[in-house]
């Protein structure tokens, strides 16, 4: 069995790790960095850029640069979080089968396809580092991700050509990395605040067991929201001063986003920073510049309500675990946004305890995922990971009520059955509406999908017995079945529609990704050939210039023709590697002939020079 990689597919950055020779370690990308920006860009030339190269050109290409795609993963277009994302993000969010999608240059991409491009880069970087093909992976998700979001993440892995062995919760993964070597049992809290999501999880670790006691969070709260508070502040101040709304200018908005992100990072170590954006926009009076000094205190005032929300969630989750705060031994901080001083201060204050910063917040989740991969593969023995479902699952019953079948906090994998009946006399079919959430009424919870059980024999209401079974696998993904106990007729639904993609669509996307992989390879080869051709043409032109009149007219004409042919081919942006190399070969051949001719011309002169020098030598006799 080949190596299993662990992937932290983050909102802002992603990380990949592998377990080998008894330890889990982060795999650097081809740029030499341990994390890769979760950014994908489409250029006007048809190139697809991923990671640092995509992030670098975001300001000049805002509408075709996709970031924070995780925030709309598995979302339906009519959900509030989707509406918020449409208002915030510069690229065009549309829908496909009712689920969120992205439109770029007239083509629709799902969040799964965009995320797959990030995963493909991580896969390729891992293969380059390990020197072997990689297929199997463990991918992490926020603990509070619902079924649709988990399913969409797994689909992204499939599209990227990965065999996703397990979907694992990020805080659980971090605890696995942190607690694997702990012999004594201890209760810990993992506070995970990333770019777009927040989770807090209470776990018990020790003696190679990692057990989740309770988990909670917000799948739409993270460092992006800190940035957005600062973006709003800067845009509003600028509008008050100039009357210009920068939010209507996608390029200005992208510059604001970069400036806000940098200011946030600087204020983690400095008490004041200056945001300086020259030529941010212009009006009839001329160009406008944005220059603003910002103190840490001012920034903390903007985000204090968001941080307070995370502290409230801490209290809820510790209570759900049946514990008091003084029973918590360690608070492990995970996610890049935990570097914000206010976050650290408030979490420390909440527990009245120093925080554990021994783990790298950007890397620990991937490291834990790699350990889980090694457990599945059998390289790590006797490790037991007991995770839980973050939200209750049930069905809609009479009166629009949600009847829970699996309560939140239930250890997974799990399987539970419950018997229901008909609501009307002679009812021949029942509709099973599968729900996820904690509210009393079905309309206030998320519908994951529905299906019909038909062919129920006529009977008074309340008589037929319909057995509904909920089965959650180790990935937290749900299968629901219903069976009429009298006839044995059954119907099953694997909750797939909630992610917006059918199995056929996923298979098509896998093929499409493979096709584009080959296209990208050819495009890269053409770029390399183009660079080599430019270099050759420059060298030949330089040689012609230096040799001047020494070059015979016929040779010069042949070389110039080959040069012109090559230059003409290079003007065609779609020229293939083979076309370019053919013209390069022709130029190389005539250039070599020139070199041979020049060498032959020089040979007699060299011999005469040598003879002349010999004639000038006076023989000396030595006694």
Swiss-Prot record:
Q: Which UniProt keywords apply?
A: ATP-binding, Chaperone, Nucleotide-binding, Phosphoprotein, Stress response
> Does the record bear Chaperone in its keywords?
yes
Question: From what superkingdom does this record's organism come?
Answer: Bacteria
Phosphothreonine occurs at 197
Q: What induces it?
A: By stress conditions e.g. heat shock.
Task: List the disulfide bonds in this chain.
Answer: none
Q: Which SUPFAM superfamilies match?
A: Actin-like ATPase domain (SSF53067), Heat shock protein 70kD (HSP70), C-terminal subdomain (SSF100934), Heat shock protein 70kD (HSP70), peptide-binding domain (SSF100920)
Q: Which InterPro entries match?
A: ATPase_NBD, Chaperone_DnaK, Heat_shock_70_CS, HSP70_C_sf, HSP70_peptide-bd_sf, Hsp_70_fam
Using the UniProt annotation, give all residue ranges assigned to the region (Disordered).
595-623
Output one GO BP term.
response to heat
Family, as annotated: Belongs to the heat shock protein 70 family.
| NCBIfam families given in the database record | PRK00290.1, PRK05183.1, prok_dnaK
> What does the protein in this record do?
Acts as a chaperone.
Give the protein's recorded name: Chaperone protein DnaK
Organism of this sequence:
Campylobacter jejuni (strain RM1221)
């Amino acid at each position: 069995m080949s190596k299993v990689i662990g992937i932290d597919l983050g909102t802002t950055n992603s990380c990949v790790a592998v377990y080998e020779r008894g330890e889990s370690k982060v795999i650097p990308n081809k740029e030499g960095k341990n994390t890769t920006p979760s950014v994908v860009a489409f250029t006007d030339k048809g190139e697809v850029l991923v990671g640092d190269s995509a992030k670098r050109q975001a300001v000049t290409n805002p509408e075709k640069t996709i970031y924070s795609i995780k925030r709309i993963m598995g979302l339906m277009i009519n959900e509030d979080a989707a509406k918020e994302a449409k208002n915030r993000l510069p690229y065009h969010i549309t829908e496909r089968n009712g689920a969120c999608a992205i439109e770029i240059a007239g083509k629709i991409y799902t969040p799964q396809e965009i995320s797959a491009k990030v995963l493909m880069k991580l896969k390729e970087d891992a293969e380059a580092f390990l020197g072997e093909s990689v297929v199997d992976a463990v991918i992490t998700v926020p603990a509070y991700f619902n079924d649709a979001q988990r399913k969409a993440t797994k689909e992204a892995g499939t599209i990227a050509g990965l065999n996703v062995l397990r979907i694992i919760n990020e805080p659980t993964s971090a605890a696995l990395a942190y607690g694997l070597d702990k012999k004594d049992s201890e209760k810990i809290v993992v506070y995970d605040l990333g770019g777009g999501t927040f989770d807090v999880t209470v776990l018990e670790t020790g003696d190679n067991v990692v057990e989740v006691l309770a988990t909670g969070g917000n799948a739409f709260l993270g460092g992006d929201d800190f940035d957005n508070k600062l973006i709003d502040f800067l845009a509003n101040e600028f509008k008050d001063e100039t009357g210009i709304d920068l939010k209507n200018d996608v390029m200005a908005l992208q510059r604001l986003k970069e400036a806000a992100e940098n200011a946030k990072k600087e204020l983690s170590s400095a008490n004041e920073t200056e945001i300086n954006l020259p030529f941010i926009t212009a009006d009839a009076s001329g160009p406008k510049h944005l220059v603003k000094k910002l103190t840490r205190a001012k920034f903390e005032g903007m985000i204090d309500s968001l941080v307070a929300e995370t502290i409230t969630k801490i209290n809820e989750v510790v209570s759900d675990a049946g514990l008091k705060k003084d029973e918590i031994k360690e608070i492990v901080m995970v996610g890049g946004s935990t570097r914000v001083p206010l976050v650290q201060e408030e979490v420390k204050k909440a527990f009245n305890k120093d925080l554990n910063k021994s783990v790298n917040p950007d890397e620990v989740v991937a490291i834990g995922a790699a350990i889980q991969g090694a457990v599945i593969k059998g390289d790590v023995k006797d490790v037991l990971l007991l995770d839980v479902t973050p939200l209750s699952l049930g069905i809609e019953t009479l009166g629009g009520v949600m009847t829970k079948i699996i309560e939140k906090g239930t250890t997974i994998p799990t399987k539970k059955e419950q018997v229901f009946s008909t609501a009307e006399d002679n009812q021949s079919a029942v509709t099973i509406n599968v729900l996820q959430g904690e509210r009393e009424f079905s309309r206030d919870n998320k519908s994951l999908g529905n299906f019909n059980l038909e062919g129920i024999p006529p009977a008074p209401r309340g008589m037929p017995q319909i057995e509904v079974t909920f089965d959650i696998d180790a990935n937290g993904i749900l299968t629901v079945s219903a069976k009429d106990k009298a006839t044995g007729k059954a119907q099953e639904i694997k909750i797939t529609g909630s992610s917006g993609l059918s199995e056929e669509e996923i298979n098509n996307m896998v093929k499409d990704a493979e096709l584009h992989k080959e296209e990208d390879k050819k495009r890269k080869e053409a770029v390399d050939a183009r660079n080599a051709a430019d270099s050759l043409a420059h060298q030949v032109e330089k040689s012609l210039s230096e040799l001047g009149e020494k070059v015979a007219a016929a040779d010069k004409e042949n070389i110039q023709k080959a040069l012109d042919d090559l230059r003409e081919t290079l003007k065609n942006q779609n020229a293939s590697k083979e076309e370019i190399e053919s013209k390069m070969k022709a130029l190389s051949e005539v250039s070599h002939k020139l070199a041979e001719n020049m060498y032959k011309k020089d040979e007699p002169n060299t011999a005469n020079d040598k003879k002349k020098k010999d004639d000038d030598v006076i023989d000396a006799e030595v006694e």
